[in-house]
Amino acid sequence: WIMGHMVNAIYQIDEFVNLGANSIETDVSFDDNANPEYTYHGIPCDCGRSCLKWENYNDFLKGLRSATTPGNSKYQSKLILVVFDLKTGSLYDNQASEAGKKLAKNLLKHYWNNGNNGGRAYIVLSIPDLNHYPLIKGFTDTLKQEGHPELLEKVGYDFSGNDAIGDVAKAYKKAGVSGHVWQSDGITNCLLRGLSRVKDAVANRDSGKGYINKVYYWTVDKRATTRDALDAGVDGVMTNYPDVIADVMNEAAYKSKVRLATYEDSPWVTFKK
């Protein structure tokens, strides 16, 4: 999965997919009442990027739906996975469940079209704080209450705070999650970060006993870092330059080992070599 980083304006969906991304990451900011409000990152953000692009969240969802609904004039068949980077740092811990409920209602209405031929992309809810694990139950309970438990097949989870792997496992246990887990590791492109935790996450994934199904590394903009990440065995790389990742994947050393994921590749099933 080549994951386009910080895709917060509707026009950027096409821009990143056309550069080679089959997945995008979108920031979601919340208002004081835990309503998802804007797709907005703000300052500071990655070096070399504008931090200030934004849409109203519901408008972005409608644009995303158009891009991921077969038959729509805006349809992009390659776009199969969307990571919502939930900026819950602005919320009190006791608002996490409420944020999950409201997120579920927004997605159901504006993205899934109330279960009636909505967008087809898989969704990952990425949460920066382990203490906000109740967001997951708020989300899953709401989809069930609204009569659409089947849509949970399309939803996965990520804790993005670079916490110890054991602590993340405990948070999932509390949230009642087993499966559909992506584990992120990374840092802004302005700084360097080693791959030791990525390797731990890959080992957990491949042990057959761990909680992790997929591992992604962020933010990867250079060819050398891309090669290191692919060598470490990641499933996804998040990038500001999807074309760089696509180029590396076409190099002789990687061409026979990795390929771009398609809609038929489940993002929840650990790839067996």
UniProtKB/Swiss-Prot annotation:
EC number: 4.6.1.-
GO molecular function: lyase activity; metal ion binding; phosphoric diester hydrolase activity; toxin activity
Gene Ontology CC annotation, any one: extracellular region
Cofactor(s) required, per the database record: Mg(2+)
Annotated CDD domains: GDPD_like_SMaseD_PLD (cd08576)
Gene3D superfamilies linked to this entry: Phosphatidylinositol (PI) phosphodiesterase
Family: Belongs to the arthropod phospholipase D family. Class II subfamily.
Active site (catalytic residues): H5, H41
Cystine pairings recorded for this chain: C45-C51, C47-C190
One protein family per Pfam: GDPD_2
Compartments it resides in: Secreted
Cofactor binding summary note: Binds 1 Mg(2+) ion per subunit.
Binding site for Mg(2+): E25, D27, D85
GO-annotated biological processes: killing of cells of another organism; lipid catabolic process
Annotated catalysed reactions: an N-(acyl)-sphingosylphosphocholine = an N-(acyl)-sphingosyl-1,3-cyclic phosphate + choline; an N-(acyl)-sphingosylphosphoethanolamine = an N-(acyl)-sphingosyl-1,3-cyclic phosphate + ethanolamine; a 1-acyl-sn-glycero-3-phosphocholine = a 1-acyl-sn-glycero-2,3-cyclic phosphate + choline; a 1-acyl-sn-glycero-3-phosphoethanolamine = a 1-acyl-sn-glycero-2,3-cyclic phosphate + ethanolamine
Enzyme class name: lyase
Assigned keywords, A-Z: Cytolysis, Dermonecrotic toxin, Disulfide bond, Hemolysis, Lipid degradation, Lipid metabolism, Lyase, Magnesium, Metal-binding, Secreted, Toxin
Tissues where the protein occurs: Expressed by the venom gland.
The name this protein goes by in its record: Dermonecrotic toxin LhSicTox-alphaIA2biii
Role summary: Dermonecrotic toxins cleave the phosphodiester linkage between the phosphate and headgroup of certain phospholipids (sphingolipid and lysolipid substrates), forming an alcohol (often choline) and a cyclic phosphate. This toxin acts on sphingomyelin (SM). It may also act on ceramide phosphoethanolamine (CPE), lysophosphatidylcholine (LPC) and lysophosphatidylethanolamine (LPE), but not on lysophosphatidylserine (LPS), and lysophosphatidylglycerol (LPG). It acts by transphosphatidylation, releasing exclusively cyclic phosphate products as second products.
